[in-house]
């Protein structure tokens, strides 16, 4: 008997689009693939022309600290959700940002500083800060996944 039908069936079972939808009771670990896809999609939109003349990664140390602080992940996402409303042609990013909240872990303590500030209508600043924020989320999730695998 050929193994091809079995392999095709297995492939269909593990494809993300054919799996059961995520629910409130689904652990966040299993939904990270979806979160990673959303982050990648936002970054793709952020790289659309016109590209800024400024360096994407040129953020001051204070902004970097605010964007990397674990307890500010949710307040920072709220700041990006407010800022995206002042931008033109950013509806695709806005809709994805709204769905990103379940990807963020709960804060372990109250924030000790204010969330990131983004100038209204400043596409380049929004793009630089959001790109840094999303890369920080990806790195944190990669570390969490590595720790989880090391435990097992």
From Swiss-Prot:
Family that this chain belongs to: Belongs to the IL-3 family.
Alphabetized GO MF terms: cytokine activity; growth factor activity; interleukin-3 receptor binding
Recorded name of the encoding gene: IL3
Glycosylated residue positions: 34, 89
Disulphide linkage map: 35-103
Keywords of the record: Cytokine, Disulfide bond, Glycoprotein, Growth factor, Secreted, Signal
Cellular location(s): Secreted
Species whose genome carries this gene: Homo sapiens (Human)
Up-regulation conditions: Upon activation of the T-cell receptor/CD3 pathway and can be augmented by coactivation of the CD3 and CD28 pathways.
InterPro entries noted in UniProt: 4_helix_cytokine-like_core, IL-3
Signal peptide: 1-19
Protein's UniProt name: Interleukin-3
Cellular component GO terms, alphabetical: extracellular region; extracellular space
Known partners and oligomeric status: Interacts with IL3RA.
Function: Cytokine secreted predominantly by activated T-lymphocytes as well as mast cells and osteoblastic cells that controls the production and differentiation of hematopoietic progenitor cells into lineage-restricted cells. Also stimulates mature basophils, eosinophils, and monocytes to become functionally activated. In addition, plays an important role in neural cell proliferation and survival. Participates as well in bone homeostasis and inhibits osteoclast differentiation by preventing NF-kappa-B nuclear translocation and activation.
């Amino acid at each position: 008997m050929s193994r091809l039908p079995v392999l095709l069936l297995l492939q269909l079972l593990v494809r993300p689009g054919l799996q059961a939808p995520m629910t409130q009771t689904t652990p966040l670990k299993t939904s990270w693939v979806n979160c990673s896809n959303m982050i990648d999609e936002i970054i793709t939109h952020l790289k659309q022309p016109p590209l800024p003349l400024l360096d994407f990664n040129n953020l001051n140390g204070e902004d970097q600290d605010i964007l990397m602080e674990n307890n500010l992940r949710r307040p920072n996402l709220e700041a990006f959700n407010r800022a995206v409303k002042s931008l033109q042609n950013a509806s695709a990013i806005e809709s994805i940002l709204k769905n990103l909240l379940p990807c963020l872990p709960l804060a372990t303590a109250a924030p000790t500083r204010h969330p990131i500030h983004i100038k209204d209508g400043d596409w380049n600043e929004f793009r630089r800060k959001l790109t840094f924020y999303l890369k920080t989320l990806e790195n944190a999730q990669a570390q969490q996944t590595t720790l989880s695998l090391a435990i097992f």
